[in-house]
Amino acid sequence: MTATTATAPTMRGGGRNELPPHLDDNLLTPRFYTTEFDKAAKTDLDIARKDFEAMFKEMEADYNLKHFDRKASLERLSELSPEDKAIYESYLVRSVVSEFSGFLLFKEISNRFKKAGRQELGQFFTFLARDEARHAGFLGRALKAEGINVDLPNLGNKRAATFFPLSWVLYSLYLSEKIGYWRYILINRHLNDNPEKVCAPLFDFFEPWCQDENRHGDCINLMMRCWPGMTKGFRGKLLSRFFLWSVFLTHTLTVCERGDFYGLLGIDPVLFDEEVIIQTNNTSRNAFPWVYNFDDGKFLEMRVQILKAFRNWRESSGLAKPVALSKFVSLILRQFALPMQKTNAVRYG
């Protein structure tokens, strides 16, 4: 569902989006998606009219409008070492690019719906785009407080987009929003209990932020319910298995490889990853026909083995590298095939 731009985007005034020497310029490679927009425009809202209208009113109310104060200072509250400063700034850059990519996707979906005469759906996704733009704007302000200016509008000027079927987009979007919700809320709870670890006021906005992510996931869930064929039979089970597994695997490798950021906040990355996965898997019972069975603990235990095998593969060389890769692939495929549980997720049709 993603693609990276090969050319660094230009900034206003003919410059380029360039990061300070201590940050990796590859962080400024947004990923963009495209899908079956004509098919999406045929979404049958009649089978979900009551729920759609309730969700529409909730998004229209924009409960977090006043919570994101544009005049609030985002200057860091504490001095950081050069190493910790780079860790914090790298997090900001990755996050702003991710949020802006989400804005562009939701905006494109909104425009396509409106062009197809589906004004309600178009406005619905405009609300989602609004929230993503607000998040990106706050992250951009936090970067400016660090002396880094990322020109967001020009990030999308020259971009390639990878095509995926509508079902893939909806499954992955739901998980992206819900796993984001659990990430933000768990960090927020930890920092509330450990205020001495709050190094920047940006983290004070994580509570309303996670509320937006949660609502977005509910919006995508509603869209999935309007396409009952996506969640039925073998297809529904396979899509549930693949996307839960791939998102959880990516989260494990990403969180543990970037453990220095969580260390900055006083969070154990392995335990954080485990809790996020447990909660996201449980939340997915509301949308997916199947979720992983964590009762025997095998899925979660294999994370440690997979992480060790991944690092061993990354660090190996010569003839040892393909052997290490083979072990890593074997482990992740075994994890993929672990037992699942059928859910009682609400479906229309």
UniProtKB/Swiss-Prot annotation:
It catalyses: Mg-protoporphyrin IX 13-monomethyl ester + 3 NADPH + 3 O2 + 2 H(+) = 3,8-divinyl protochlorophyllide a + 3 NADP(+) + 5 H2O. Pathway: Porphyrin-containing compound metabolism; chlorophyll biosynthesis (light-independent). Catalyzes the formation of the isocyclic ring in chlorophyll biosynthesis. Mediates the cyclase reaction, which results in the formation of divinylprotochlorophyllide (Pchlide) characteristic of all chlorophylls from magnesium-protoporphyrin IX 13-monomethyl ester (MgPMME). GO terms for molecular function: iron ion binding; magnesium-protoporphyrin IX monomethyl ester (oxidative) cyclase activity. Its cofactor is Fe cation. Its EC number is 1.14.13.81. This is Magnesium-protoporphyrin IX monomethyl ester [oxidative] cyclase. PANTHER family: MAGNESIUM-PROTOPORPHYRIN IX MONOMETHYL ESTER [OXIDATIVE] CYCLASE, CHLOROPLASTIC. Residues 1-23 are annotated as: Disordered. Pfam families: Rubrerythrin (PF02915). Signal peptide: none annotated. Residues 1-10 have a biased composition (Low complexity). GO terms for biological process: light-independent chlorophyll biosynthetic process; photosynthesis. It comes from the Bacteria. The keyword Metal-binding applies. Belongs to the AcsF family.
